[in-house]
């Protein structure tokens, strides 16, 4: 059974790990070196988590944090999924042992529901064109924007 809890400031260290997982590259590349988390264009998605407007949830399976979906509003033009300065940019990651087990969709739907409740009319994300999670994003209402 999956439960959800709020991603809060006490989750800062584990959020870095989830951000690292979210930086997906097609096989055979595997995970990027952790040093990528020092890149300013990557750090913006997790650094100082808990700012006003940050929104995130953690998927908990049998008492274990399985992954998270988080969103942050950034200034226009900042971030790979930037649309404007009011639309949150979304990140999602599941620990490898919880991937491909049907957890991503309920996690994302719960996070999107909370975003709508917070007054966000839209949410953006960026994804590698070969990422196998694209059908999940489409089922959750995302579409391709050029």
Named regions from a protein language model:
Residues 104, 108, 128-133:
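Short glycine/proline-centered loop/turn elements that form peptide/ligand docking sites
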Residues 138-146:
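Conserved acetyl-CoA-binding loop of GNAT-fold acetyltransferases
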Residues 115-128:
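Conserved GNAT acetyl-CoA-binding A-motif
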Residues 58, 64-74:
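Conserved beta-strand in the GNAT
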Residues 1-13, 17, 21:
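Conserved N-terminal entry element of GNAT/NAT acetyltransferase domains
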Residues 19, 32-56, 60-61:
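Active-site rim helix/loop that mediates acceptor-substrate recognition in acyltransferases
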């Amino acid at each position: 059974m999956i439960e959800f809890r709020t991603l809060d400031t006490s989750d800062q260290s584990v959020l870095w790990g989830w951000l690292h997982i979210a930086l997906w590259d097609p096989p055979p590349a595997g995970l990027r070196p952790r040093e990528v988390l020092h890149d300013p264009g990557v750090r913006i998605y997790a650094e100082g988590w808990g700012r006003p407007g940050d929104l995130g949830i953690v998927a908990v399976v049998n008492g274990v944090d399985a992954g998270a979906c988080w969103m942050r509003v950034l200034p226009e033009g900042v971030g790979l999924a930037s649309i404007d300065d009011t639309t949150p940019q979304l990140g999602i990651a599941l620990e490898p042992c919880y991937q491909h087990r049907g957890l991503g969709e309920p996690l994302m739907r719960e996070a999107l529901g909370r975003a709508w409740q917070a007054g966000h009319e839209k949410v953006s994300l960026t994804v590698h064109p070969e990422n196998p999670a694209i059908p999940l994003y489409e089922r959750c209402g995302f579409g391709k924007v050029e």
